[in-house]
Amino acid sequence: NLSKNRTQSCATCHNPEAAFIDDRDNGVSKMASLGDDLKSLGDRQAPTASYAKFSPDFHFNAKKGFYVGGQFWDGRETSLEGQAGGPPLNPIEMGMESKKEVVDRLKENSFYVESFKSIFGKDIFKNDENAYIAMTKAIASFERSDEFSTFDSKYDRYLKGEYDLTPLEDLGMSIFFSNNNNSCASCHVLKG
C-alpha cells in the first residue's frame, strides 16, 4: 500500500463502486476526505476521477472571461500525471515522507516490480525520481481508460436514442442548457 499507515489507496478516496468519489461516512457530511490516519481531514472532498481525462490544462479563457480546466478542485495540476503524484506525498492524504519512500513501497510488490521493469525498462528502480514518474504515468494511463469514462448515464443513453427523458428530466435539461451567463452548462460542460 502506498500510504503511510497502509490504510488507504487511490481507490479509498476514488471508489470505483461510487463513480470514483469518496463515499465514506467521515462525520463532516462528506465535505472533506479522511486522511491516512483515519482522523485527519483534508481541505476538501476528493473530486471524482471520472472523466478527468477530458479536463483541459488550467488556463484563462479570454472569450469566456474565466479560468477553466486543470486537475483537483483548484486546477493546480495540469495533467493526470501531476495529479497522481500529489496525494502520496500529501501529509494528510496518504502521508508518505518522500518519493523514495513511495518507490520502496512499490518495490515490496513483486507484481509491480515485474510490471514496471517490463514497461519502463529493467533499470527503472535505479533512480527514485524516474520510478516515481513511472508510477504517475501508470496511474494516469489507467485514469485515461474507458473504466473512468463509461458514458452510460441516462443523459448519455438519451443522446444515443436509447432513453426517453421524463417531462421533469426534459425541463431540467432545458434549465441546465439555458442560454444565459448563469446556466449550469457555463461550468459543467457536457459537449466539446
Language model features with spans:
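Periplasmic c-type cytochrome electron-transfer domains
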Residues: 1-192
